[in-house]
Amino acid sequence: MKIREIFKKEKNVIRAMWIVALSPFALLFLMLTLAALGVFGRMPSFEELENPKSNLATEIYGDNGHVIGTFFVENRSYVQYEDLFPQDSAAHITLGGENVPPVVAALIATEDVRFRNHSGIDIPSLFRVGVKTILLQNSSQGGGSTITQQLAKNLFPRDTVRNRGKISRTMKLVQSKFKEWITALKLEHNYTKEEIAAMYLNTVGYGSNAYGIKSAAATFFGKTPDELNVQEAAMLVGVVNAPTR
């Protein structure tokens, strides 16, 4: 009798382990199915994902090739991933066996330590995200959102929920989170990790009307992104979560 009970307990444990292991994949399949059926409303098209729109500043160059003025609604200029690397290779940061720019290393360490290992969604953080978003009614970009999810939210902002009732607000936040996950998966499919990191740094606001890492580096330190040291890069990444206005 005792042997049967032991086998029964082991069987239940194995079953529970399988349920835990397969639940994320079942959730992903459900999300994609509901998205295909239009339950989450309009999703960004592949064309929009391949050519995201942002307000860029118009830069005026002098004969010497230097910027002499800008016109903008948002002070934003794009920079490529390769242009984030310091000219001195000794200033490069080694992360996971790869050289990365200091500002990208600071971003990963601060926002998404498993950035290079997931496909847009950090499965171990799903439960924390669920508790924070649904139970605590906290819609901030922290609490487990990956860099790719935050990029999805920056490129395709959520609808406001301030004037909704509690139930309606909760349902809208859940719907927005599902859309954010699906968009993150699509971004990971369309872009490399390096491109995603650069896009994120180019789209976020750093305060003082500085949008994008190029404008932020110039505004706060009078430098280009490749001239930032580790401390300056860490400060700019930290400012993203609490920018000055």
Feature locations, PLM:
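N-terminal type II signal-anchor transmembrane helix
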Residues: 1-63, 68, 134
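Peptidoglycan glycan-strand catalytic modules in the bacterial/periplasmic cell-wall system
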Residues: 61-245
